[in-house]
C-alpha cells in the first residue's frame, strides 16, 4: 500500500555487499522523495530524489558519498504516497 513515510531496517555497503533502495511512484504526477540514511553513531546522510509518475527509481546505496563501507537504516518521506523496498545482495566467493 502506498504511503508517505517508509522505514527500512538494515543496509550495508561493506565487503561484497550491495544495497539498493527502490522507490515506486504509482501517482499520475512526479514526486519528490527525501531519503535519510541513518548511520552508526547518530549521523545522517540526507539526499532527495525526483521520481517520475508511474515509474520506479533505483538507488545504489554503495555509490553515495558517505555510505562507503558502512551499515545504515533508511527513512524515506514522499511528497505523495510511494512504495519502497530495500534489496541487499552478497557475492559469495566460489
Please describe what each predicted stretch is:
Residues 1-94:
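Gly/Pro-rich, tryptophan- and cysteine-flecked surface segments typical
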Amino acid at each position: 500500500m502506498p504511503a508517505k513515510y517508509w522505514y527500512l531496517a538494515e543496509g550495508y555497503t561493506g565487503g561484497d555487499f550491495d544495497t539498493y533502495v527502490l522507490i515506486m511512484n504509482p501517482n499520475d504526477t512526479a514526486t519528490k522523495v527525501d531519503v535519510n540514511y541513518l548511520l552508526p553513531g547518530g549521523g545522517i546522510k540526507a539526499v532527495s530524489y525526483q521520481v517520475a509518475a508511474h515509474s520506479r527509481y533505483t538507488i545504489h546505496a554503495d555509490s553515495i558519498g558517505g555510505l562507503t563501507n558502512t551499515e545504515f537504516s533508511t527513512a524515506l518521506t514522499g511528497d505523495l504516497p510511494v512504495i519502497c523496498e530495500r534489496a541487499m545482495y552478497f557475492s559469495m566467493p566460489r
